[in-house]
Design a protein with these regions (language model features):
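Conserved acidic carboxylate
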Residues: 10
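Two-component/phosphorelay signaling modules centered on CheY-like receiver
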Residues: 13-33
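Acidic, metal-coordinating helix/loop segments flanking the phosphotransfer/catalytic sites
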Residues: 20, 34-54
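Active-site residues of response regulator receiver
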Residues: 57-58
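The feature encodes the CheY-like receiver
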Residues: 62, 88
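Short amphipathic alpha-helix used as the core "switch/output" element in two-component signaling
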Residues: 65-78
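Hydrophobic/aromatic residues positioned on beta-strands within the core alpha/beta folds
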Residues: 83-84
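C-terminal output helix
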Residues: 90, 108-118
Length: 136
């Protein structure tokens, strides 16, 4: 099985390090790419050579908010999981309305997070499995 290409969009360095460690220890083969803000995420995603299987997106980002990234890529057939510290019902509903497949609130149990990511991939498939061309 080829590794899942996951783009993690997270401005908190501690959370990004933890996610890299958790994904590295999971049973899923993963290649994790990290963007530190919304602008960097949009730049990475504008590269036609890069097509992630999943985007894990924080909403509270510097430069360009996660909601803008979410709205821009909702039609790209890439599953997007919002992983945010927001507990605001309106913000959660807006993220789901904009196309997030799942909203996971921080902090969360690590195993629950891994199970959620696995479940999303199983339920929605990867862009490649859904007929979207993938680079490489």
């Amino acid at each position: 099985m080829k590794p899942l290409e996951i783009l993690l969009v997270e401005d908190n360095a501690g959370d990004a390090v933890l996610m890299r460690q958790v994904m590295g220890e999971s049973k899923i083969p993963v290649k994790l790419h990290i963007a530190r803000d919304g602008e960097q995420a949009l730049n990475i995603l504008s590269d036609a050579e890069f097509r992630p299987d999943l985007i894990i997106l924080d909403l509270n980002l510097p430069r360009i908010p996660g909601s803008v990234v979410l709205e821009r890529f909702k039609s790209e057939n890439i599953p997007i999981v919002v992983f945010s510290s927001s507990w605001n019902d309106a913000e959660i509903q807006n993220a789901l309305k904009l196309g997030a497949r799942e909203f996971i609130q921080k902090p969360t149990d690590i195993q629950e997070f891994i199970d959620a990511v696995c479940g999303i991939i199983q339920k929605w498939g990867t862009p490649e499995e859904n007929g979207v061309a993938s680079a490489g």
